[in-house]
Swiss-Prot record:
Species whose genome carries this gene: Salmonella paratyphi B (strain ATCC BAA-1250 / SPB7)
Gene responsible for this protein: tus
Any one biological process term the GO annotation gives: DNA replication termination
Family to which this protein belongs: Belongs to the Tus family.
Official protein name in the record: DNA replication terminus site-binding protein
Any single Pfam family the record assigns to this protein: Ter
InterPro entries according to UniProt: DNA_replication_term_site-bd, Tus_dom1, Tus_sf
Function: Trans-acting protein required for termination of DNA replication. Binds to DNA replication terminator sequences (terA to terF) to prevent the passage of replication forks. The termination efficiency will be affected by the affinity of this protein for the terminator sequence.
Location within or outside the cell: Cytoplasm
Gene Ontology molecular functions: DNA binding
Keywords: Cytoplasm, DNA replication, DNA-binding
Principal location class: cytoplasm
Amino acid sequence: MSRYDLVERLNGTFRQIEQHLAALTDNLQQHSLLIARVFSLPQVTKEAEHAPLDTIEVTQHLGKEAETLALRHYRHLFIQQQSENRSSKAAVRLPGVLCYQVDNATQLDLENQIQRINQLKTTFEQMVTVESGLPSAARFEWVHRHLPGLITLNAYRTLTLINNPATIRFGWANKHIIKNLSRDEVLSQLKKSLASPRSVPPWTREQWQFKLEREYQDIAALPQQARLKIKRPVKVQPIARIWYKGQQKQVQHACPTPIIALINTDNGAGVPDIGGLENYDADNIQHRFKPQAQPLRLIIPRLHLYVAD
């Protein structure tokens, strides 16, 4: 497929996402809102977009106000829709839930509508990350050439739909991206970087090349069987824990956008019990269960690469 055809499909898919989101928000407003609870988080400024989040103050919104914020959030796709001071790199998050009363027919209609939106979002992400054939550093420029000001994460982010929950509880998750690597895999990656010299601020091209050579030597000095692990922290994120009474099970969802909960009164479902979201404080985290970590030694800080001792 030619680059021109891909761009045509990219634009066409994005326009469909916009149209279907507009139709969904209109459709939801035709349904009876049983309960709504969302939590706005402080906006991240451009100056603070790379700073660690040690505290997050939560503001709660209820009822129609919560619904208005949520429906606007689903369609928040461009930086032009937000304050000029707000970071375009930090994700815009609005945890919470909207609960609507449905019958069998309207439940199926909304399920199909949301499924279609999520399919389009997945297709759009696939075009950008895979079909474009571009490295991650080049994708930003390519996407914004065709869709100026797009917040790609918001375009990728799918909607979460749940049916007939009994209880919904919110909380915070501290996570790491974990990837196990062999010594030879890391050496191969470093070799590719060495073969494509470039400058990386604040280093000159020569300084960066010297830094890569030192890293290569450090890895090459390890035994071939050395166990290496990338353990990169991800910024704390809101989560929702859903309890289904009939199935006697709990399901946890990431909750960057309000969950849509359909309450089917044809099946005798009732309004769920919805909890709040506490302020986040990194110095006051309580772990339910924290297994003993494997001893690791940091070997390449910029890659968050560790070796198991």
